């Protein structure tokens, strides 16, 4: 038994030079088996993201033994982080960026990954641009702002479209339904099963009746509902509805063919081709394609520095500058 443990220990303590040799042989084999003119050529067909995913998804059962499993992990990690090319700081950047993307809400994860940020600083800048866009003239539906956007836009607009005389009966029916459903709850432990089943049937029939009443009101105002939906689609602000197939429809740019999952993102992208810059600075008349960029530009006139370092108190006008500054503190703290 001790002999086996000793052998395993020697395998686990293999040097990085041995692993590098394995990597070199593997890379040479890949390139020899690939046609240089083929689209599957090693240097162009495999990206660091591919190796990152393989590294994270690799399972012990995918290898014949512990030695092969460890060697494969070394190989995939090496191909992902590329220590022969990247500095220690760049490798840390990749690891931190991966974890940062992992903790984002799923909607934001998908959006950020489509834009392929190269580092954490670029990712933060992109997310802050989105946050500012939410407060600007164009409201964009986004992950954690979903409830805010729905609350801010939907109730007021729907109220304007539907007359109050039609909304009130629905409200009263819902209130009545709530009271009646409460009254159906059994308060006596000795109530027979037949009574419970009867109450359940009453709840079901009541729910069906209310659903039909609400559906009738919505159908009576079909043209107004279409107007409401069309307005938000034009502005690129149509909110995602669960189970709505139209939301999944992809938006394609006619100029370059790039695909977007949201019409709002397509509208912003099309300004690159059209050169449209609807946001102008009041001070110098310089125009910008996005309101978020205009907000950053205005700080050059006002001297506003909203981003403050908690370690030394130094303030910055842009988050990217604060991000670079914070790295210096981190490097000083790390021995």
From Swiss-Prot:
One MF term in the entry's GO annotations: RNA polymerase II cis-regulatory region sequence-specific DNA binding
Gene Ontology cellular-component terms listed: chromatin; cytoplasm; nucleus
Gene3D superfamilies in the record: Classic Zinc Finger, DNA breaking-rejoining enzymes
Tissue occurrence: Expressed strongly in liver, moderately in skeletal muscle and weakly in kidney, pancreas, spleen and prostate.
Pfam families xref list: SCAN (PF02023), zf-C2H2 (PF00096)
C2H2-type zinc-finger residues: 251-273, 279-301, 307-329
Known role: Isoform 1 and isoform 2 act as DNA-dependent transcriptional repressors.
Complexes and interactors: Isoforms 1 and 2 can both homo- and hetero-associate.
Name under which the protein is recorded: Zinc finger protein 396
Organism lineage string: Eukaryota, Metazoa, Chordata, Craniata, Vertebrata
């Amino acid at each position: 038994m001790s002999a086996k443990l000793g052998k395993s220990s020697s395998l686990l303590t293999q040097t990085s030079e041995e692993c590098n040799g394995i990597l070199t042989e593997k890379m040479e084999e890949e390139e020899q088996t690939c046609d240089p003119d083929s689209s599957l050529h090693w240097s162009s067909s495999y990206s660091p993201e591919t190796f990152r995913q393989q590294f994270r998804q690799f399972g012990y059962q995918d290898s014949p033994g512990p030695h092969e499993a460890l060697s494969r992990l070394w190989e995939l990690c090496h191909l992902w982080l590329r220590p022969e090319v990247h500095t220690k700081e760049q490798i840390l950047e990749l690891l931190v960026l991966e974890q940062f993307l992992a903790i984002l809400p799923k909607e934001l994860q998908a959006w950020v990954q489509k834009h392929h940020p190269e580092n954490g600083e670029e990712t933060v800048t992109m997310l802050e641009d989105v946050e500012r866009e939410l407060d600007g003239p164009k409201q964009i539906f986004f992950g954690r702002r979903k409830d805010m956007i729905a609350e801010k836009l939907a109730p007021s607009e729907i109220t304007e479209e539907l007359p109050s005389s039609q909304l009130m009966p629905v409200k009263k029916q819902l209130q009545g339904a709530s009271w009646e459903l409460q009254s159906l709850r059994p308060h006596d432990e000795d109530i027979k099963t037949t009574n419970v089943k009867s109450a359940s049937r009453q709840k079901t029939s009541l729910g069906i009746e209310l659903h039909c009443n609400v559906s009738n009101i919505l159908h009576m105002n079909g043209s107004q509902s279409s107007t409401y939906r069309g307005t938000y689609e034009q502005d690129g602000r149509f909110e995602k509805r669960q189970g709505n197939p139209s939301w999944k429809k992809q938006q394609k740019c006619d100029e370059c063919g790039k695909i977007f999952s949201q019409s709002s993102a397509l509208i912003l992208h099309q300004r690159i081709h059209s050169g449209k810059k609807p946001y102008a600075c009041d001070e110098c008349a310089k125009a910008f394609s996005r309101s978020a960029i205009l907000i950053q530009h205005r700080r050059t006139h006002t001297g506003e520095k909203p981003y403050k370092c908690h370690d030394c108190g130094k303030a910055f006008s842009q988050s990217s500058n604060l991000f670079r500054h914070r790295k210096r503190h981190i490097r000083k703290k790390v021995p």
